[in-house]
Regions:
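Short, well-ordered junction/capping motifs at the entry into regular secondary structure
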Residues: 1-2
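Noncatalytic, beta-rich nucleic-acid-contacting surfaces in large DNA/RNA-processing enzymes
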Residues: 6-10, 14-264
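Calmodulin-binding IQ motif helices
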Residues: 267
Length: 267
């Protein structure tokens, strides 16, 4: 695991542009993105969530924090993001989810998977709508826009006598009055679409218990081994306790016929 040097760590506190550029340089590597975001949080730099009205393709500095770059969301291409940014610049912010779909519909990279991942990653949260509501209606909204475009191409007139070829927007699709996803469900969605937990961390409720059990933060161990004068607190072969979420695990038999487990733990 790569760690920033102490000089770089000090730099990131006062130079958020440096960290934003560093994150943008590893956009295609979710493990590296997660690593550098952890460094940002250690430095006290806030990670701002993805937002269709504020995010760019890469990570950018905003209000003392770093805004999440949309390229880091799965199934979101640069062409789609650049079109989105042009529409914002030319016609102003997207006013609603349906306004976003209407204005972005003719983008060649616009598809249901891209829209769904924007919803699941929280990129529409600032519009004060629930992710559960958008997940319920997004396909209906896109299908309604497609049907409206088809009718316009065919030259059909609406009740107000719009000329053939004009873009008659479909009626606003009402949002169902349903509960929002739980915090755990939202975090799981974020992890699936970005490789990261953005709105929180599943371990947050267990950190106090982990400390009581004597669990050692992994960054404390790594910092000790990366110190210029060598490890002081820890040593090779030492048994320690850590706490985290097991994301993958497999067992194997050693040459001595002993059973061992290899686990990937997200902390």
């Amino acid at each position: 695991l790569h760690l920033l040097s102490r000089r770089q760590r000090q730099m990131c506190i006062r130079d958020r542009e440096y960290m934003a550029a560093l994150l943008t340089s590893v956009l295609d590597n979710s493990d590296k993105v997660a690593e550098y975001i952890a460094e940002c949080r250690d430095c006290g730099i806030e990670l701002l969530p993805p937002d269709v009205n504020r995010s760019s393709d890469g990570f950018t500095v905003e209000d003392g924090g770093i805004r999440f770059g949309l390229v880091a969301i799965k199934n979101i291409g640069r062409g789609f993001i650049q079109t989105m940014m042009r529409r914002r610049e030319q016609d102003g912010p997207f006013r609603s989810f349906q306004d976003f779909c209407q204005r972005m519909f003719d983008c060649t990279d616009m598809n249901k998977r891209a829209v769904e991942n924007l919803i699941r990653s929280g990129a529409f949260d600032s519009m004060k709508v629930r992710r559960s509501q958008l997940i319920q209606v997004f396909e209906k909204v896109l299908d309604s826009i497609a049907e409206s475009r088809r009718k316009n191409v065919e030259g059909q007139l609406d009740l107000f006598g719009m000329a053939a070829g004009e873009d008659a927007p479909p009626a606003e699709t009402p949002l169902p009055d349903i509960p929002e996803f739980t915090a755990a469900e939202r975090m799981f969605m974020e992890k699936e679409t970005t490789g990261l937990y953005l709105s929180g961390h599943p371990m947050a409720d267990y950190r106090a218990l982990a400390r009581q059990a004597g669990a050692v933060p992994i960054h404390t161990i790594l910092e000790d081994f990366s110190a210029e004068d060598g490890p002081v607190r820890f040593a090779d072969g030492q048994s320690i306790t850590i706490a985290g979420i097991v994301t993958a695990s497999r067992t194997r038999t050693t040459r001595n016929n002993a059973l061992m487990a290899l686990s990937l733990i997200h902390i």
